[in-house]
């Protein structure tokens, strides 16, 4: 689960490397984000020629979490790292490439563009 101050890797080619969660969107009671949830984050580390510079506040969707979570069919899945993809104002990915696998739950949340860019969907 991703909560405030959780640091995540960035799984796209916007140039940002690490982001830190500031807030989880979806109501005042929502404290933790799962796969497919949108968060507000601050870019903590980026490459010099990045689209998302260090210190900027961005929206991102969580695509991988390390905590095992159950699927409706009874299976569990977990990933090796916490990762997110940076979004633009239209809730589409800002980058043009996605690195690493992403979870199938993004299809339910209508992030089909991320699924089509991803090399592997688990």
Swiss-Prot record:
Q: Which GO terms describe its cellular component?
A: cytosolic large ribosomal subunit
Q: Which GO terms describe its molecular function?
A: large ribosomal subunit rRNA binding; structural constituent of ribosome
Cross-referenced PROSITE patterns: RIBOSOMAL_L14
Keyword terms, alphabetized: Ribonucleoprotein, Ribosomal protein, RNA-binding, rRNA-binding
Record has rRNA-binding as a keyword: yes
Q: Which Gene Ontology BP annotations are present?
A: translation
Q: Which SMART domains match?
A: Ribosomal_L14
Looking at the keywords, is RNA-binding present?
A: yes
Q: Which InterPro entries does the record associate with it?
A: Ribosomal_uL14 (IPR000218), Ribosomal_uL14_bac-type (IPR005745), Ribosomal_uL14_CS (IPR019972), Ribosomal_uL14_sf (IPR036853)
Q: What does this protein do?
A: Binds to 23S rRNA. Forms part of two intersubunit bridges in the 70S ribosome.
The text of the family note is: Belongs to the universal ribosomal protein uL14 family.
What interactions and quaternary structure are annotated? Part of the 50S ribosomal subunit. Forms a cluster with proteins L3 and L19. In the 70S ribosome, L14 and L19 interact and together make contacts with the 16S rRNA in bridges B5 and B8.
- NCBIfam families annotated for this entry? rplN_bact
Q: What is this protein called?
A: Large ribosomal subunit protein uL14
